[in-house]
Regions:
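Bacterial signal peptide processing site
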Residues: 30-32
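Repeated scaffold domains used in trafficking and secretory/extracellular systems
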Residues: 73-76, 119-124, 160-168, 209-217, ...
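Conserved blade-ending motifs and adjacent loop-strand segments that build the rim/top face
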Residues: 250-265, 312-338
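A short helix->beta-strand "capping" segment at the edge of beta-propeller domains
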Residues: 44-71
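Short coil/turn segments at the loop-to-beta-strand junctions that recur within blades
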Residues: 67, 109-116, 158-164, 203-209, ...
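Residue-level detector of Asp-centered blade-edge/turn motifs that repeat once per structural unit
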Residues: 79-81, 126-130, 168-171, 220-222, ...
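Blade-loop segments of beta-propeller domains
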Residues: 65-68, 103-130
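Loop/turn-rich, solvent-exposed surfaces of beta-rich toroidal or solenoidal domains
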Residues: 269-316
Length: 363
C-alpha cells in the first residue's frame, strides 16, 4: 500500500444528501447520460458476498513462470487477442504470456541507463492500435515504446508529469493526474506524440485535491475506460475527448477532503476512515473493495467488499468475498482485475512457479 501526501487541504468534502431511487449502469461508451448517488455505510455488513451472487462460473488459467524468476506480485494486467501482459510489483518488469497456454513468451525488463532502457516503470499501458507496450519512464520523462516481443521501437519526451495513461485513440494518448498543480496540466487530458495538447478532458481538480492513493484506477474497455476518481468517489466513463459520470459513491467512512493533504498525518487522524483500492464494472454489477485504516497499524489490510447489482439496486456489503462455486482455498490477497464487461479476474500469486488467474465469468 502506498500513500502520498502532496499538500494541505482546507475544505471539507461535499456531503451528498440525495435520496437514491434507482440504479442504472449504462456501460456503453456512447450512452452515459445518467448519474446516480449510492449511499454506502461500511459498518453495515452481511456475512459474505458469494460468487454465486454475480458469477456464472469460475475458470483457472495458470501462467507459467520460468525457474528462478522472483515475481513479487501482480500490479497490473492487460490483454489483447492472444496475449496477457503482467506488470510485476517489484523489479521484474513486464511479463508477456500466451493467452491460450499460459506459457511465458517474453520478459520485458530492459532496466539500465541507456536511451533504449528503462530506469523506472512509473506507469504502462497497451497501444492495441499499433501493437506496442507503452512505458512512462519518470526518471528521464519519456514515454518509451516496445513491440509485443519486447523490442525497443521508439520514445518521445513529455514535459508533463502524470500518474497514469491510456491509449484510447489511434493518434493520441490520454493522461491522468488527479492532483492540483499550478505549473502543469491536471485532471485528464489527451496529447499527440509531439506532446501537443489535443483536449482537456476534465479539470475537476480543486486546490484541495493534493492527496493521491496508489495505484490509479481504471478499467480499460477498448476506446474508453471506467475511471474511479478518489477525490470525489465518482465512477466515470472517459474517452479521448469526453468524460461522463455514472455514479457518485456516498461512503460514510470516506476520508474528509480537509484531511487528505495533511503532511505527516498520524494513524490516529486516519483511524476508521476508508479509501478504495480496487473496483470492477460490468453490464450488471460493480464490485468495490474499501480499505479502512487502523490507528494501531496503518498498513494492516482491513478490506470491506461492496457489490452493487445495477439491475435491482441492491447493495451488499461484507468483509468476506467467498468462492462458493468451486471447492478451493480462498485467495489470501485482495486482488481484483478487469478483462471486459463480462469477465473479471482475481489473482493467486502465492505459488513459486506460476501465477494462477481466477477468471470470473459474470452473470
Amino acid at each position: 500500500m502506498k500513500i502520498q501526501y502532496l499538500g494541505l487541504c482546507s475544505k471539507k468534502m461535499k456531503k451528498y444528501s440525495y435520496i437514491f431511487y434507482y440504479f442504472l449502469l449504462l456501460v456503453s461508451c456512447e450512452n452515459t447520460d445518467k448519474q446516480n448517488t449510492i449511499d454506502i455505510d461500511l459498518s453495515k455488513t452481511d456475512s459474505c458476498i458469494a460468487y454465486s451472487m454475480f458469477v456464472k462460473s469460475v475458470e483457472n488459467l495458470d501462467l507459467h513462470i520460468t525457474d528462478g524468476l522472483p515475481i513479487t506480485g501482480v500490479e497490473r494486467l492487460y490483454f489483447d487477442e492472444s496475449k496477457i501482459f503482467v506488470k510485476d510489483s517489484g523489479r521484474e518488469g513486464i511479463l508477456v504470456f500466451d493467452k491460450g497456454s499460459g506459457n511465458l513468451l517474453k520478459r520485458v525488463n530492459p532496466f539500465g541507463e541507456g536511451p533504449e532502457e528503462i530506469k523506472r516503470i512509473s506507469s504502462f499501458c497497451l497501444d492495441t492500435y499499433h501493437k506496442k507496450i507503452c512505458i512512462f519512464d519518470q526518471s528521464d520523462m519519456k514515454v518509451k515504446m516496445y513491440d509485443f516481443s519486447g523490442k525497443y521501437a521508439c520514445s518521445y519526451p513529455t514535459d508533463m508529469f502524470f500518474i497514469d495513461m491510456a491509449k484510447l485513440d489511434k493518434n493520441s494518448m490520454t493522461y491522468f493526474y488527479p492532483i492540483y498543480a499550478e505549473e502543469q496540466f491536471y485532471g485528464i487530458w489527451s496529447s499527440d506524440s509531439l506532446n501537443q495538447l489535443k483536449k482537456q478532458v476534465s479539470s475537476h481538480v480543486t486546490k484541495e485535491c493534493m492527496f493521491h492513493y496508489f495505484p490509479m484506477l481504471y478499467n480499460m474497455n477498448d476506446t474508453c475506460v471506467y475511471y474511479y476518481d478518489r477525490n470525489w468517489d465518482e465512477i466515470s466513463v472517459v474517452t479521448s475527448d469526453s468524460i461522463q459520470t455514472l455514479y457518485s459513491l456516498g461512503v460514510k467512512q470516506r476520508i474528509p477532503l480537509f484531511k487528505k493533504g495533511i503532511r505527516d498525518i498520524t494513524p490516529q487522524e486516519l483511524d476508521g476512515y476508508a479509501i478504495l483500492p480496487n473496483f470492477d464494472c460490468s453490464n450488471n454489477f460493480i464490485l468495490c473493495s474499501f480499505h479502512t485504516f487502523d490507528k494501531n497499524d496503518i498498513r494492516k489490510k482491513n478490506i470491506t467488499w461492496v457489490l452493487l447489482d445495477t439491475r435491482t439496486g441492491k447493495v451488499t456489503i461484507s468483509k468476506k468475498l467467498k468462492n462458493d462455486l468451486m471447492a478451493e482455498d480462498e485467495i489470501e490477497n485482495n486482488s481484483l482485475f478487469y478483462m471486459n464487461n463480462y469477465t473479471w479476474l482475481r489473482v493467486d500469486d502465492s505459488f513459486e512457479d506460476l501465477i494462477r488467474l481466477k477468471i470470473l465469468h459474470l452473470q
